Amino acid sequence: MASVTLGSWIVVHHHNHHHPSSILTKSRSRSCPITLTKPISFRSKRTVSSSSSIVSSSVVTKEDNLRQSEPSSFDFMSYIITKAELVNKALDSAVPLREPLKIHEAMRYSLLAGGKRVRPVLCIAACELVGGEESTAMPAACAVEMIHTMSLIHDDLPCMDNDDLRRGKPTNHKVFGEDVAVLAGDALLSFAFEHLASATSSDVVSPVRVVRAVGELAKAIGTEGLVAGQVVDISSEGLDLNDVGLEHLEFIHLHKTAALLEASAVLGAIVGGGSDDEIERLRKFARCIGLLFQVVDDILDVTKSSKELGKTAGKDLIADKLTYPKIMGLEKSREFAEKLNREARDQLLGFDSDKVAPLLALANYIAYRQN
């Protein structure tokens, strides 16, 4: 498959036209074109070039398949650990333990439970790429993590995925009850916008850019984003593979998973003072790694144990959900992930290679993660 693109109109049909999963939806061009492009690497100049240095991969592809390498001088693990620690401190400060204690305990339980912090790190890296400071991006970074945590709390509820384990710990509703878990998610959702609007420095970021950032975040989680993906996802359980295809699955995950990653990068670029061109290139980059994240997640769900993942393994298979391995097969899913990684990296061609290194490494981190 040389190209996989969702156009502005997406038609997904079922033989029974009254099935809730049947959709005729006008998308906001949430597409990530996948083409057979050449890998990229770094030369001595300060821009990203199109020739490559490659090493073997064992997660997304078989051992004989290839991937691109980052500059040997860039230590991505130190970078992401350092940034994640700063995000954790900022989140701890933003959501202190106060009255009513129970709701704040529930919010903090999931918000501070660890996790990769991919979304806030992406937000910070995008801000720094366009010339902004880490401190400028931190309120936006915290906001996207609050919303991500909300989505996990709600996703784990019995009425959704009915999961008992998240980030290696009992899920929120198992500890605090379903009623408080719902409210904790609601509180994180509303506070994310309050924090983004009030904590972003008005001395650095113009009100126009703050309003733009708020609008982007709201769109990413509503009926043009996360909610759209979730409702089509839960309506697709048990569908016959003959009735759905790759476009259907892409619609789900470009909205359910990629939309918030896209917002993370876009918010970072907006508050960092990025140009419209820089913002759109980072949008496309994040859209591709968002879809990549889900493809890899589906692969890990059928190849790793619950202990390795820190969450229940094989739950999508048990729930008869649509996944990339189910539709494409495991090997084709790995090949598709490799194409997504290359396409994402191509969006960063021409940026300063020193500043772009974290984002290139982040794409590979998502592609080759083990949990």
From Swiss-Prot:
Reported cofactor(s): Mg(2+)
Reaction equation(s) it catalyzes: isopentenyl diphosphate + dimethylallyl diphosphate = (2E)-geranyl diphosphate + diphosphate; isopentenyl diphosphate + (2E)-geranyl diphosphate = (2E,6E)-farnesyl diphosphate + diphosphate; isopentenyl diphosphate + (2E,6E)-farnesyl diphosphate = (2E,6E,10E)-geranylgeranyl diphosphate + diphosphate
Binding-site residues, isopentenyl diphosphate: K116, R119, H148, R167
Transit peptide limits: 1-51
Claim: Chloroplast is one of the keywords in the record: yes
Sorted UniProt keywords: Acetylation, Carotenoid biosynthesis, Chloroplast, Cytoplasm, Isoprene biosynthesis, Magnesium, Metal-binding, Plastid, Transferase, Transit peptide
Pathway participation: Isoprenoid biosynthesis; farnesyl diphosphate biosynthesis; farnesyl diphosphate from geranyl diphosphate and isopentenyl diphosphate: step 1/1; Isoprenoid biosynthesis; geranyl diphosphate biosynthesis; geranyl diphosphate from dimethylallyl diphosphate and isopentenyl diphosphate: step 1/1; Isoprenoid biosynthesis; geranylgeranyl diphosphate biosynthesis; geranylgeranyl diphosphate from farnesyl diphosphate and isopentenyl diphosphate: step 1/1
Expression (tissue specificity): Expressed ubiquitously.
GO molecular function, one term: geranylgeranyl diphosphate synthase activity
Ranges annotated as spanning the membrane: none
Sequence positions that bind Mg(2+) 1: D155, D161
NCBIfam families the record matches: FPPsyn
Function: Heterodimeric geranyl(geranyl)-diphosphate (GPP) synthase large subunit. In vitro, the large subunit catalyzes mainly the trans-addition of the three molecules of IPP onto DMAPP to form geranylgeranyl pyrophosphate while the small subunit alone is inactive. Upon association of the two subunits, the product profile changes and the production of gerany-diphosphate is strongly increased.
Subunit structure: Forms homodimers. Part of a heterodimeric geranyl(geranyl)diphosphate synthase. Interacts with GGR.
Entry similarity comment: Belongs to the FPP/GGPP synthase family.
Protein name per UniProt: Heterodimeric geranylgeranyl pyrophosphate synthase large subunit 1, chloroplastic
Upper taxonomic lineage: Eukaryota, Viridiplantae, Streptophyta, Embryophyta, Tracheophyta
Gene: GGPPS1
